[in-house]
Amino acid sequence: METTKPSFQDVLEFVRLFRRKNKLQREIQDIEKKIRDNQKRVLLLDNLSDYIKPGMSVEAIQGIIASMKSDYEDRVDDYIIKNAEISKERRDISKKLKAMGEMKHADVKAE
């Protein structure tokens, strides 16, 4: 009975994909943290604008706050999009890894 060993290139590809999958998972967690942080900043700026009094050069302060809030909201949106893209790539890699494992398992059973 002959056993088919995966080629060296197959093993390297499997390791490369597995490492990429793990790296993507870490990036997802990092981005989720950034999303939370920026959402907190948006809330902070909302609350801050409630405390600004008319005697404090309201137009200038409110303009700055609106600009900062917009920047943070844009960052949150960018992180959400990036997270979705990374999640999709991670799912694709998981499918490839699973298929590679199933092919190896099928090759072993065929013998």
Swiss-Prot record:
This protein's UniProt keywords: Coiled coil, Cytoplasm
Q: GO terms for CC?
A: cytosol
Q: Where in the cell is it found?
A: Cytoplasm
**Coiled coil regions in record:** 14-41
InterPro entries assigned: DUF496 (IPR007458), UPF0265 (IPR053375)
Q: What does this protein do?
A: Pole-localizer protein involved in the regulation of several cellular processes.
HAMAP family per record: Pole_loc_TmaR (MF_00683)
Q: Which family does it belong to?
A: Belongs to the pole-localizer TmaR family.
Protein name (database record): Pole-localizer protein TmaR
Q: Which organism is it from?
A: Salmonella arizonae (strain ATCC BAA-731 / CDC346-86 / RSK2980)
